[in-house]
Structures are given as structure tokens and as C-alpha cells.
């Protein structure tokens, strides 16, 4: 039996693609309804007023307005505040 795997064989040489997670719209930015605010795994940020959460924990805007980051009961939340 060979103790080497051969000229072009290797067990390594692959990597997974990046998941492109993170905050997509920052505090103070004006957004329209449906825009993605945060891509995340788990609820690092929780949805506040005017923000929805998708099945993969993505936060998105339900209303148009300005993005606001804050805390509520010790949790980081993302809100949409109407622009006058």
C-alpha cells in the first residue's frame, strides 16, 4: 500500500465563503421600508419600533425613517424614528 497519496491529491485546499454579516445601515441613516439594517446569526441586536426580524435573524425596516441604535432592558435594539 502506498504511504503517499499521489502527485495531485490533497486533503486540504478548500474554504467556505464569507457570510457577509454585520450592520448594513448605521445610526442616523435614513432608510425606506424593506431595507436590511443588520445581518446576524442569533439576536445580537433586537428589533425595536419600526423594525422586523426575518427567520435568519436579519433586521429590516418596516417603516421609512432614520435608524437609531439603543438599549432596552439591557438589550441592544434597533429602532426606526420618523423623519420630520
From Swiss-Prot:
Molecular function in Gene Ontology: structural constituent of ribosome
Region (Disordered): 1-22
Keywords tagged on the record: Ribonucleoprotein, Ribosomal protein
Coiled coil segments of this chain: none
UniProt-listed InterPro entries: Ribosomal_bL27, Ribosomal_bL27_CS
Domain of life: Bacteria
Any one of the GO CC terms: cytosolic large ribosomal subunit
Compositionally biased spans, kind Polar residues: 7-19
GO aspect biological process, one term: translation
Sequence similarity: Belongs to the bacterial ribosomal protein bL27 family.
Protein's name in the database: Large ribosomal subunit protein bL27
Amino acid at each position: 500500500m502506498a504511504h503517499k497519496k499521489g502527485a495531485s491529491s490533497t486533503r486540504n485546499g478548500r474554504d467556505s465563503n464569507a457570510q457577509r454579516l454585520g450592520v448594513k445601515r448605521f445610526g442616523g441613516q435614513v432608510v425606506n421600508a424593506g431595507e436590511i439594517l443588520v445581518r446576524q446569526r442569533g439576536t445580537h441586536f433586537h428589533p425595536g419600533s419600526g423594525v422586523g426580524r426575518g427567520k435568519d435573524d436579519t433586521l429590516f425596516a418596516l417603516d421609512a425613517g432614520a435608524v437609531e441604535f439603543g438599549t432596552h432592558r439591557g438589550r441592544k435594539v434597533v429602532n426606526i424614528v420618523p423623519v420630520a
